[in-house]
Amino acid sequence: VNALKTLSAVGIASIFLLAACGNDSTEEDSAEAGGDINYSEEVDYTITGIEPGAGVTETANNTLDTYDNLDGWELEESSTVGMLAQLADAISNEDPIIVTGWIPHHKFLQYDLKMLEDPEGTMGESESAHTITRLGLEEDMPDAYKLLDAFNWELDDVEQVMYEAEDSDVETAASNWVEDNPDKVDEWTENIEEADGEKIEIGSMPWEAEQASAAVMEQVLTEYGYDVTVTEVDPAILFESIAGDSVDATVAPALPITQGHLYDRYEGEFVDLGPNLDGLQNGFVVPEYMDIDSIEDLEPKE
């Protein structure tokens, strides 16, 4: 009996020993797969960017110059299409990647992404898209003016239009959004009388979020009897056109930073109806599977 007890004790001890060894191995594997990854080295100390002339490109370069831990890093300038292709390829293989990004954008619906914290604030503070009109629009088209003044929506709304437009076109996506959101549209159009074919020109910019906002406004104004023209131009030309009364209104300008210099240049020559979309933000964006949360988590190139 004593011999059996001894054998049993030895067997149990062996089981615990084997289990402990197994746990050590599992923990090591987990560490190798998770927090011990040098993401800075994995992305070759490179931020994947977009066009050289874009505002986010300028702020990204400023960020590389500001953070000491980004010493030796480079911004790979490309195009928006090129950046999105590299992002899609990295995510399909669960590879690390850091890209210049902005909110709103349909990629946040398409993928699980996060924007890295920016303690120095070099990528810019959160902004809002504003509705501005030419002087005199309230007197000339009071109902259109009231509708423009009431226009307000959320990031999820504009990203939904942008996402759907990837597989169709922005006009179709905007029409579907208006049809699916009658309560919100009813808030904008409360006490608005239908027009009788009055012409109104909405200015926009050649980027997806701005196109989505303009397309939704075009859809609603058209349903209320206006003959709407949407014109896409460079931001500088847009502000000049509003100030010169050749464009009636826009829902596009990002303030106070991105188009702030144009706002200051023409201030007093237009009417600012205030924000229609809050939460616009530029930043460094990574997939959720990357175990970093801040720009300060990155390491300098040695």
Predicted stretch roles:
Residues 85-91, 105-112, 214, 236-267:
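Pocket-flanking alpha-helical
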